[in-house]
Amino acid sequence: RYSSYYGSTTKSYLAQTADGGYQRAEYINDKIVVETYDSKRNLVSSKNVEAELPIFGGIYIGKDYNYAVFGQMNKEESDECEVFRFVKYDKNWNRLVQCSVKGANTYIPFDAGGLSMTETDGKLYIHTCHEMYQSDDGYHHQANCSFVVNEEDMTLVDSYTGVMNLGEGYV
């Protein structure tokens, strides 16, 4: 029997470090808990990184930097409301700079889906989902959205937050 199943963002991440150890980052109680382990799996360090907005999107442990994505609801459907924040950290999780996205046809960020990131050629690619502004049928439909951010200065290079496949549904 089918019962409303929704996707959600991943809260726990694990990556191997250059020295053969591991770094674990997990979103718990409005903060990112970062633990570093040596190659024998002994805890070397632990750090808490405060969430910057109320809704957690995801983490990316990159080659030279780490990234976290946060968001917040936009109940007024205001194009001036910050709905996504992409934050760049150094490899020790010290905050460096952010990229803010406002409006973006977003009522609720990350709703009913996940978030994935990758990097290549100095660009950070973020693919996630959102519940969009109310449509003519009176509903807030869910859809995918994508962003490309320049890693050096964290400027937004490209984004897509519109409605796809109008004739077939929302994807």
Named regions from a protein language model:
Residues 1-32, 51-53:
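Beta-strand-rich domains and repeat architectures in extracellular enzymes and scaffolds
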Residues 1-5, 42-49, 95-107, 155-162:
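A short beta-strand motif characteristic of beta-propeller blades
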Residues 7-16, 52-62, 106-117, 161-171:
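Repeated scaffold domains used in trafficking and secretory/extracellular systems
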Residues 19-24, 64-69, 122-127:
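Entry beta-strands of beta-propeller and related beta-repeat scaffolds
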Residues 26-30, 76-82, 134-143:
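Short, solvent-exposed loop/turn segments at conserved positions within beta-propeller repeat blades
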Residues 43-75, 82, 100-105:
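Blade-loop segments of beta-propeller domains
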Residues 127-171:
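Acidic, serine/threonine- and glycine-rich low-complexity intrinsically disordered segments
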